[in-house]
Amino acid sequence: KEQGFETIGVIRGDELRDKISENPTLSFAQECGMRFEFVTREAYRHKTETAFIEQLQVKFGSFYLVPEGGTNDLAVKGCEEILTEFDAHFDFVCSAVGTGGTISGLINSALPHQKVLGFPALKGDFLQNEIHKFVNNKNWELITDYHFGGYGKVTTEFIEWMNWFYAQTGIPLDPIY
């Protein structure tokens, strides 16, 4: 909204069409001027296929497609700028992982002595292949034991640990990631 970008959100689950006000993320996006295209869960499975994208182009005209999670070559390149010379003394760089873009940028820009550890918010082994699309380095590892059953799921113990960690370090952590 501030930059004048016209945005269209392709939303999985056409049942959400009448529940925008109940969803803080959709409400905020709508307040910022985003238009929505609600699609069935079945249709959403085809979101990266040419025919699906062409249907969107017919309806909305020319657009730049930001993939789910935001991961693409430009995102990875941008995330390569996260680490700076001030981070050179760290041996480990840890990051939450959603779709792999941020950690890919960190892997590409980490120094030879640094190991990048990623903690996926999603269950499943698909992220290894996604990350390999963007990196050649071997300086990384995914720690896959902390997804708590899937995206956005947490346990009481995890929240307690996050609070303890914040009290010890002053670093806030995101419970979703």
Task: Please annotate each region the language model reported.
Residues 1-177:
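PLP-dependent amino-acid enzyme catalytic core
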